[in-house]
Amino acid sequence: MTLFQEKHFALFGNPVGHSLSPPMHRAAYGNMGVPVTYEAYRVETAEEIIPMMKSLGIEGASVTLPFKEAVLRYLDDVTENARTIGAVNTIVNRGGRLIGENTDWIGLVRDLKDHVQIKGKTFAVLGAGGMARAAVFGILHEGGKPVIFNRTGERGEALACAFNCQALPWVALDGFRADVLIQTTPVGMAPDINSSPLKKESLANFHYVLDAIYNPLTTMLLRDAEEMSCIPISGVGLFVYQGAEQIRIWTGLKPPVARMRQTVLDALMKE
């Protein structure tokens, strides 16, 4: 008989129907042998999340697009890292207070370290949303140099100013060289799988290309990257590692990372 009391966790976002967070988390808790439920809830505004957590007795939540930044103002508190990043993808109930945390940056760093050394490398970061903010934070934390590119120049400049790093105009990507390209925008995400944020030829100046999108497993950007002799990195590792850190925060237990990864890969192969 387990000493672990039943807990209820959830995913909040819009949309959530495509998300593999529920099967990944359920597989993890099943493997761990703990009584946990994990459900997905589509909400229209970030403001709805906190009342739903309280009314449904949800003790931990994953927050996905488009609410990672907007949800901050409704929380009782946020961790120092989440406050610095300016985005929350994880909420934990600590003694009745709902605390915001960010595990996206941890997922990104762990995934990058599986492929490349971060310290001393230059990273071109596409986008200026919550995932981009986590990426910039993680790269700087590990001694890398991020350079931000965003189609809306003002948002890119604001992000660069917040982290004291560089932002360049989107058109400058064609001639920009970096060790790693990190793509954090939704362009290319299912069902829009035949879109890419960049022309294939623009990838010639990068060694590694990481797409934060995990569905599809191989985005058009990653297919183009391979054709341009870059090393492609799918968003699966990032997704699994950030989820594993959520589980550690919520339960205090070691998550079964290999089981989680296999669950995600199996689900993607069926699509």
Describe each PLM feature range.
Residues T2-V116:
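Phosphate/diphosphate ligand-binding glycine-rich loop within oxidoreductases
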Residues G13, N102, L112, V116-L140, ...:
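Glycine-rich adenosine-cofactor-binding loop
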Residues E142-F163:
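NAD(P)-binding Rossmann-fold cofactor-contacting core
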Residues C161-P232:
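Rossmann-like adenosine-cofactor binding region
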Residues H207-V257, R261-T263:
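Rossmann-fold NAD(P)-binding glycine/threonine-rich loop
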